[in-house]
Every structure is written in structure tokens, then in C-alpha cells.
């Protein structure tokens, strides 16, 4: 059940398309009746049924679970956000932005945007959704006190103000034709003006919050006042966390839950061979990366970083760890198939001799090194760490692997040690990905890597209206990250979900498993 790989919007509404429209008409308007499809057309499916309750198990569940969009950082958080809140735009299966709470976006220069809101939309408590809610929801991410996970994205928002009863004018610091894509980011969903207590989950999404126990369970019931006619279909959804892959699979096949994510590639045959159950593969830009920070003098050495990259046996990872459900990576975050992928960048191969030379040069061979922290919650990271350990032993490199519990890993270990693994969900565009994870001042800059030329290219690419020039800029950024960056990205991993075949309407959106975390409003129960 494979779908097309994440193509960054290829075949959809590209930057060049946007600029052509601006040039031809003096004004670009993207809306439900215009160049972008209506939201529902992207998810057309036969004869949805109404009613029923399902339980869904996600691998990411901990006491850090949140209902505050600014604080969300896991797939489970994003699932909650799309259950209880709605964004101005929404991505479809081709990563083309669709209008959602916004009825249209208009601009003449990609810097000043007029956002027209849908009329008649209400929050779960009955309050109408208005311009003040949008202004607050976008601009709160700029406030350092909010500690937003998407502050680097929000820094682009120079000013937002209500300019009509259903209208917001958003002015950017510099032109960015990707704004419709950026507004689909999970953290940028719309909340009530002035909200600081998110415990009630008041939004205007397809489900209303019934109960929320961080690390245990989230229950939502259908919002009968949802603004999309006929949706959602289910009466109730319970989202639980089961970090152990085997336990999560057993919960599915025993009938305890009806949908799970992050299936171990070694278990795919068990799912497909069990009557009544099916596997959903979504090819994507998901990657698990080895993070090499500068906290340790040996790890800080560029020769150590490059040596570790050569130590990865990428083909072995693809076949043995991911069982073919991945494509080989090249230590930069743009996957093959993406329209800005740099195919001319030479692929780094497994080269133990070169790795040994570089690691010897860095003083790493025979030295006591900090352990590599890995967890089952970062797809394949434990297996990657063990394979690196085994490859290192052959050349005199002593690597220790610390298998950390998934509960609290992202709060207590990720980015907190010289050697850790990350697990990065795909982003809606190259700009969003590079801004959140590689810009020098990004909170999620995993390795703490800083490169002034990279930052300059990133900012220049946003306002570049010539798509060929922009592709060259993104290509140059990929070269810089691959050759000078401090993360090893050996593979891009398919999302693997398992589901009860009575659950219908489950599609693929390459930003994440479970339909890009947006399954809640799209699935129904054929009992």
C-alpha cells in the first residue's frame, strides 16, 4: 500500500506558479474556489459512515504530552492539535496547501498577505472565530515567554492586524511565497485570543476534548458544529501511548486498538498475513539522525564527524534495519524525489578505511568516548547505534550504546549529550525544515551547528522568485549541510501504520504517519 514519496509539493502550487499569477494579474489569490482545491476534494472517499468509537495507539506518549500548540514536538502532540484545533491552511497528499479556516490568501508581493476567514466558524464553547484569534495565535509564537517550538518560523511575522470583520493582514519581514505552506504547520493552529490555559483544549477542530491525561490517554468526541459539512464521522476517538513496538502491534492484532503507528519493519509480514488487518506505507522525508555536538573535545573535531559519516553502512541499514522500507540518505535532510533535491551531490559511501584515517586524526581511536544515546522511540536508532559500534570495533573505535527509555527521552536526552539520536518528521517545505533544524539560532538546531553562509542562503531563498535560482540555493545548502554539518542522516524512512480493515478513509500525507497526523477528521468505521 505504497504512496508517492514526499515531493515537496511537486505537481502542486509551486512558488513559480505563484509568481506567474502575481505578474499576470497584479494580485495572487488562493482560495477554496480558486487555484487551490477545496479542503474536502483532497480526501474524497466513497460512502463514509457516521458513528462508532476507535482506540488509537501512538509510540510517542509521555508526561510531556501537551494541548498547547506552541509546546508540541511529537507526532502524538500533532495528532491532538489536528483533533481539537484547525489551521488556516492544510496540506493534502501532494503537500499542496488547501484552504482550511482561511477562505483565501491574497498577495501582490509575497510579503503582505490578506487572509480572508471563513464566516460562521465557532470554537467548541460557541464563541465565533475572528481576526483577533488569528492575530493572537500567530504572534504568540514570537514572544520568548511562550517558549514556542516554532519561534524561528514565527520570526518572519513582522505584523498581524485585523483589517476587517473576517480579515487579517499579515506582513512578513521579507517576501516568502511559501506562506500558505507554513501556515499548515501543526503548531500554527488557531486558538482563542488570549488563551494561556490550554487544559480544556478549546479549538474549532473536528473533535471536542472529553479527557486528557498526559502520558496515558486523550479522548475526543465529535464536534457536531464542525465547519466541514458531514465531518467528522466517528463519535469518539481515544488516543493512547504504547512506546514498545511489540506491545503496540499486539494491541492492534488482539483488537484492543484499531490503528497504530511506527510498526517495526521486521513485523510488516505479521500484519499483512493476519486476516482483517492491513499495512499502510507512506514514503517520506522522515529521518533518524546521529547528532554530534561540540560538548566533547573529540566529538567536536570535524574529522570525527566526517569519520562517523563514513562509518555508516547505509545499504545495510536500508535492507537489514528497515527491510527495504527506506531510501538511502546523504547526511542532509532533503530526500530524493523532493523537487529541490540536489542529485549532483556525490553519495557518501561506507568506507571503513577512510573512517579509520579520519577518526585516528581526531584522536578517537582507543580513546574513551561519551556514550551514544538511542531509544526505541527514534526509528531504528538502537540498531543504527549497535551497527556503528560493531563497525567501530573493527577499526579500534570504542563506542558505547546507552539504550534510553522512550519515556522522557526527548526532554532528558535529545540534544543533551555529545552523541545522541534524533528522529525528525518531514516538514512541509525545504524552508521550514532548514529554518527549524539548521538555522544557527534555531532551538531545534540539534548539533548546535552554526554556518553564516548557510543562514544567508536560507534567507535569500525565501524571497527568490526564480524557481531555478531557488533550487540552486537549496542545492548549495544541501552541500554545506552534508559536508560540514554535524548530523549523520543515513536513510529516509517510510511511515508504517497498521490498521483494522474496518477502519476506512485512511490515506497518506507525507508529513507523517496516520495521514500526516490528520486521520481523525477523515476516517470512519465500517462495523
What is each model feature region?
Residues 328-361, 376-381:
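Structural transition elements
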Residues 394, 398-409, 435-501, 527:
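Extracytoplasmic/peripheral linker and loop segments enriched in polar/acidic and small residues
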Residues 106, 150-192:
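Surface-exposed binding/hinge segments that line
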Residues 225-270, 390, 398-400:
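Ligand-site clamp/hinge motif
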Residues 57-109, 139, 202-204:
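N-terminal lobe/hinge region of extracytoplasmic solute-binding protein
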Amino acid at each position: 500500500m505504497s504512496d508517492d514519496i514526499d515531493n515537496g509539493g511537486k505537481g502542486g502550487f509551486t512558488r513559480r506558479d505563484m509568481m506567474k499569477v502575481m505578474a499576470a494579474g497584479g494580485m495572487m489569490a488562493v482560495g477554496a474556489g480558486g487555484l487551490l482545491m477545496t479542503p474536502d476534494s483532497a480526501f474524497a472517499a466513497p460512502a463514509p459512515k457516521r458513528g462508532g468509537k476507535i482506540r488509537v495507539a501512538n509510540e510517542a506518549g509521555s508526561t510531556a504530552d501537551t494541548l498547547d500548540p506552541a509546546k508540541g514536538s511529537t507526532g502524538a502532540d500533532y495528532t491532538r492539535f489536528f483533533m481539537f484545533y484547525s489551521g488556516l491552511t492544510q496540506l493534502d497528499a501532494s503537500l499542496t496547501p488547501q484552504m482550511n479556516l482561511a477562505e483565501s490568501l491574497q498577495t501582490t508581493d509575497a510579503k503582505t498577505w490578506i487572509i480572508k476567514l471563513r464566516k460562521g466558524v465557532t470554537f467548541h464553547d460557541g464563541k465565533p472565530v475572528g481576526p483577533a484569534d488569528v492575530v493572537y495565535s500567530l504572534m504568540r509564537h514570537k514572544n520568548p515567554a511562550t517558549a514556542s517550538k516554532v519561534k524561528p518560523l514565527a520570526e518572519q511575522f513582522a505584523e498581524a492586524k485585523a483589517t476587517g470583520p473576517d480579515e487579517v493582514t499579515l506582513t512578513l519581514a521579507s517576501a516568502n511565497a511559501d506562506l500558505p505552506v507554513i501556515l499548515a504547520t501543526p503548531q500554527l493552529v488557531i486558538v482563542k485570543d488570549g488563551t494561556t490555559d490550554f487544559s480544556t483544549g478549546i479549538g474549532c477542530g473536528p473533535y471536542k476534548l472529553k479527557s486528557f491525561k498526559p502520558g496515558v490517554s486523550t479522548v475526543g468526541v465529535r464536534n457536531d458544529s464542525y465547519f466541514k459539512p458531514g465531518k467528522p464521522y466517528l463519535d469518539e476517538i481515544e488516543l493512547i501511548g504504547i512506546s514498545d513496538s511489540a506491545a503496540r502491534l499486539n494491541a492492534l492484532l488482539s483488537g484492543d486498538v484499531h490503528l497504530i503507528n511506527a510498526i517495526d519493519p521486521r513485523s510488516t509480514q505479521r500484519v499483512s498475513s493476519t486476516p482483517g488487518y492491513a499495512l499502510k506505507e507512506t514514503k517520506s522525508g522522515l529521518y533518524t539522525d546521529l547528532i554530534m555536538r561540540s560538548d566533547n573535545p573529540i566529538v567536536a573535531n570535524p574529522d570525527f564527524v566526517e569519520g562517523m559519516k563514513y562509518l555508516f553502512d547505509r545499504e545495510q541499514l536500508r535492507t537489514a534495519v528497515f527491510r527495504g522500507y527506506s531510501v538511502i540518505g546523504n547526511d542532509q535532510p532533503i530526500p530524493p524525489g523532493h523537487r529541490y533535491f540536489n542529485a549532483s551531490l556525490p553519495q557518501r559511501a561506507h568506507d571503513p578505511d577512510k573512517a579509520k584515517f579520519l577518526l585516528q586524526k581526531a584522536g578517537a581511536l582507543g580513546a574513551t568516548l561519551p556514550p551514544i544515546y538511542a531509544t526505541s522511540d527514534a526509528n531504528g536508532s538502537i540498531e543504527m547505534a549497535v551497527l556503528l559500534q560493531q563497525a567501530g570495533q573493527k577499526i579500534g573505535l570504542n563506542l558505547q550504546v546507552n539504550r534510553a527509555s522512550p519515556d522522557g527521552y526527548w526532554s532528558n536526552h535529545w540534544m543533551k549529550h555529545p552523541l545522541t539520536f534524533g528522529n525528525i518528521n518531514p516538514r512541509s517545505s525545504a524552508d521550514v525544515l532548514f529554518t527549524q533544524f539548521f538555522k544557527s539560532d534555531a532551538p531545534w538546531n540539534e548539533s548546535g551547528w552554526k554556518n553564516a553562509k548557510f543562514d544567508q542562503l536560507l534567507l535569500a531563498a525565501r524571497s527568490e522568485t526564480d524557481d531555478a535560482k531557488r533550487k540552486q540555493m537549496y542545492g548549495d545548502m544541501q552541500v554545506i549541510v552534508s559536508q560540514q554539518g554535524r548530523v549523520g542522516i543515513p536513510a529516509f524512512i517510510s511511515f508504517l501504520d497498521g490498521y483494522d480493515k474496518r477502519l476506512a478513509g485512511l490515506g497518506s500525507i507525507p508529513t507523517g504517519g496516520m495521514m500526516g497526523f490528520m486521520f481523525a477528521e477523515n476516517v470512519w468505521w465500517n462495523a
